[in-house]
Amino acid sequence: MSEAVETQPPAADTVSAVKGMKKNGKQWHDNKTAFRPRANQTSWDKRTAERKALAATKAKEKELKEEKETERQRRIDAIKTKRAAKEERERFQKMEEKMHKRRVERLKRREKRNKMLKS
């Protein structure tokens, strides 16, 4: 009798895992799997920790973007002020030239008058 018991293989090894039905009953479709929502697989503490980490990274990214934008705005303002100063200088230079020309013209007219009076 002991020999008969030894020859039989254990029942647990031969039984394979039960698979779900084919989708739509067709061979080429995948097997159905058990519906297991992802929400219950991770713990609440782990999810809150992930949210905090994500919020921290987003805050850091926002801060870096703001710094970058302020630097860009500062450069733009510097360029604008330089351009405005250059335009102002050019305007004054043109005005000085005009004023000088007018003064020279006035002096020439005076000289002509004086010549006419003397002659």
From Swiss-Prot:
<keyword id="KW-0539">Nucleus</keyword>
<keyword id="KW-0698">rRNA processing</keyword>
<dbReference type="GO" id="GO:0006364">
    <property type="term" value="P:rRNA processing"/>
</dbReference>
<feature type="region of interest" description="Disordered">
    <location>
        <begin position="21"/>
        <end position="47"/>
    </location>
</feature>
<comment type="similarity">
    <text>Belongs to the CGR1 family.</text>
</comment>
<comment type="function">
    <text>Involved in nucleolar integrity and required for processing of the pre-rRNA for the 60S ribosome subunit.</text>
</comment>
<dbReference type="GO" id="GO:0005730">
    <property type="term" value="C:nucleolus"/>
</dbReference>
<feature type="compositionally biased region" description="Basic residues">
    <location>
        <begin position="100"/>
        <end position="119"/>
    </location>
</feature>
<keyword id="KW-0690">Ribosome biogenesis</keyword>
<dbReference type="Pfam" id="PF03879">
    <property type="entry name" value="Cgr1"/>
</dbReference>
<dbReference type="InterPro" id="IPR005579">
    <property type="entry name" value="Cgr1-like"/>
</dbReference>
<feature type="coiled-coil region">
    <location>
        <begin position="47"/>
        <end position="105"/>
    </location>
</feature>
<feature type="compositionally biased region" description="Basic and acidic residues">
    <location>
        <begin position="82"/>
        <end position="99"/>
    </location>
</feature>
<keyword id="KW-0175">Coiled coil</keyword>
<feature type="region of interest" description="Disordered">
    <location>
        <begin position="82"/>
        <end position="119"/>
    </location>
</feature>
<protein>
    <recommendedName>
        <fullName>rRNA-processing protein CGR1</fullName>
    </recommendedName>
</protein>
